[in-house]
A protein has these predicted regions:
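Conserved alpha-helix/loop element of class I SAM-dependent methyltransferases that forms part
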Residues: 13, 23-48, 64
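Class I SAM-dependent methyltransferase SAM/SAH-binding core
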Residues: 50-53, 59-109
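A short acidic, Gly/Pro-enriched loop at the edge of an enzyme's catalytic core
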Residues: 112-123
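A short SAM/SAH-binding and catalytic strip from SAM-dependent methyltransferases
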Residues: 121-135
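A short glycine-rich, Lys/Arg-flanked "PGG" loop and its adjoining helix->strand segment in the class I
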Residues: 136-148
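Conserved class I S-adenosyl-L-methionine
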Residues: 153-199
Length: 399
C-alpha cells in the first residue's frame, strides 16, 4: 500500500483532533497576528479576506481563524472524508461556521488550486507537511494558492521532535513504530520513555490514541532542522520571514555587543542560527512569495535613507522631549501578544527616532538637527536591535 494511502487510513480510523480537543476552535491557539504583521513588514494591520487551512482535520483551526477574522472567508481541506464529515457537523454550532467551507482534497495534487478557488491572502498548514511523501509538491501548490503578497504559516517537526529519539527506542522493546496498536504494553513502554527522557512537559504516555497514531507512530515522519525545511521552501519559491520559537531566543542577545555581532543577518538567518544551536521540536514559520526588504546594515550612509516604521507588536511610553541628545533614558517595551517585556537604555536620539517612526521620514530626516553628534556605528546597532526584536521595520527610501 502506498504511504499516502496508509497515512489517510490513520486519520480515517482516528480523525484529528480527537474528541477531547474538538471545541469548534476554542482550544486552537493561533500565532499572534501582531507578530506576523511585524515580520511581514506590513505598514497596516493584516486582515486577510480569504484563508486556506490545508490539512484541517475536523476543523478546529479553521473555526479559530473564522473567530479571529470575522470578515474573512475560510476554506479548509483534508484528504480524509471522515474528518470532513465531522467538521461539517461541528460547523453547525461553531461561531463563524457559516463562513467556513470544507472540502475533501489532497494537498499534494495540483487539483487543490481548482478545488480551493480564488487566491488566498493566508494559507496555514499546521502539523501536516512532516507526514507528506513529497513536501516540495505541496509547497509549490501553496505558492499557486497564494496572492502575490500572501503569507504561508507552516508548522513542521523540528530536529528535536520526540519522534527522533523515541521511535528507535520503541523498536528496542519490540514495538513497530510504523503502526499504532493500542495496548497496555505500548502504554507501559511510553511511560518508561517518559521517565527516562526526564518527564517531558507533555507526557506522551497520556496522549490520545489519535495523536500517537499520526504523530509518534506511522509510516513517515520528517523531523528536520530549520535550514532543511527552508531549503524545501526556497526551491518552491517561498521566502522565510521568521520563526516564532527563535523569536524568543533572540531576546537573550539584548547586550548590544552581542547582537551587533549578528549583523547583517536577517531575522530568518538568525532563526536558522538559533535552531542550529538549540534545535526546536516544532517550527512555526511564516513565509511569503514576496522577498523581505534587504536592509543595508553594512552601509551606514545608505541606511540613513531608510524609513523607520513602528510595528504593532509592542506598546511603550516614550520619555519627554528635550535634554541632551546623548542623554540615556530607560525605555520599557511590552508585548502582550508574545508575552514579552524588554528594558532598554536608549539615548535621547533613539527615543526621537521611535517617536517619529511612522514610515514617512528617513533616519537622516529625523536626525537632521543633530546627525553630526550621533555616532553612525551606534545608530546602526540600535536600529538592528529594534529590527531583530520586531519593534521596527526599515522601509526602502523609494516610495
Amino acid at each position: 500500500m502506498r504511504i499516502g494511502n496508509r497515512i489517510r487510513g490513520i486519520y480515517e480510523r482516528r480523525p484529528y483532533p480527537p474528541p477531547s480537543l474538538r471545541g469548534a476552535g476554542a482550544s486552537w491557539k493561533l500565532l499572534p497576528i501582531e507578530w506576523i504583521d511585524a515580520i511581514s513588514e506590513r505598514t497596516t494591520a493584516y486582515a486577510p479576506a480569504r484563508i486556506l487551512v490545508a490539512g484541517c482535520g475536523v476543523g478546529a483551526e479553521a473555526f479559530a481563524f473564522a473567530r479571529q477574522f470575522p470578515a474573512a472567508e475560510v476554506v479548509a481541506v483534508d484528504f480524509s472524508p471522515r474528518s470532513i464529515a465531522i467538521a461539517n457537523r461541528l460547523r453547525r454550532t461553531a461561531k463563524g461556521g457559516e463562513r467556513v467551507r470544507f472540502e475533501v482534497a489532497d494537498i499534494t495534487s495540483r487539483a487543490l488550486v481548482k478545488i480551493a478557488g480564488d487566491p488566498f491572502d493566508l494559507v496555514s498548514c499546521h502539523g501536516v507537511l512532516s507526514y507528506v511523501p513529497e513536501p516540495g509538491a505541496v509547497l509549490r501548490n501553496f505558492v499557486r494558492c497564494l496572492t502575490p503578497a500572501g503569507v504561508l504559516i507552516l508548522g513542521v517537526n523540528g530536529a528535536s521532535h520526540p519522534t527522533v529519539r523515541w521511535r528507535p527506542v520503541l523498536s528496542k522493546f519490540g514495538i513497530d513504530a510504523d503502526e499504532f496498536r493500542e495496548s497496555g504494553r505500548v502504554r507501559e513502554v511510553l511511560r518508561v520513555c517518559d521517565s527516562l527522557s526526564g518527564y517531558p512537559r507533555i507526557s506522551l504516555a497520556e496522549r490520545d490514541a489519535g495523536y500517537l497514531a499520526g504523530d509518534l507512530f506511522g509510516p513517515l515522519n520528517r523531523a528536520l532542522p530549520l535550514a532543511e525545511w527552508n531549503r524545501f521552501c526556497r526551491r518552491a519559491g517561498l521566502h522565510l520571514l521568521g520563526s516564532y520559537h527563535a523569536n524568543f531566543d533572540v531576546r537573550d542577545l539584548l547586550n548590544r555587543d552581542l547582537h551587533a555581532a549578528l549583523m547583517p543577518r536577517s531575522r530568518a538567518e538568525v532563526a536558522e542560527l538559533v535552531d542550529t544551536l538549540q534545535p526546536a521540536s516544532f517550527h512555526q514559520l511564516v513565509l511569503s512569495r514576496r522577498a523581505p526588504i534587504k536592509t543595508p546594515w553594512t552601509e551606514g550612509n545608505r541606511l540613513l535613507r531608510q524609513r523607520p516604521s513602528l510595528t504593532s507588536l509592542y506598546t511603550f511610553r516614550l520619555p519627554g522631549r528635550g535634554g541632551p541628545w546623548r542623554r540615556t533614558r530607560t525605555l520599557t517595551l511590552k508585548s502582550r501578544p508574545i508575552n514579552t517585556k524588554v528594558t532598554l537604555q536608549a539615548p535621547q536620539w533613539e527615543i526621537e527616532i521611535l517617536r517619529r517612526s511612522h514610515g514617512e521620514h528617513s533616519l537622516a530626516q529625523i536626525l537632521d538637527p543633530v546627525r553630526p553628534s550621533v555616532p553612525l556605528k551606534s545608530l546602526v546597532e540600535a536600529m538592528y536591535l529594534l529590527y531583530q526584536l520586531g519593534v521596527i521595520n526599515l522601509l526602502p527610501a523609494e516610495r
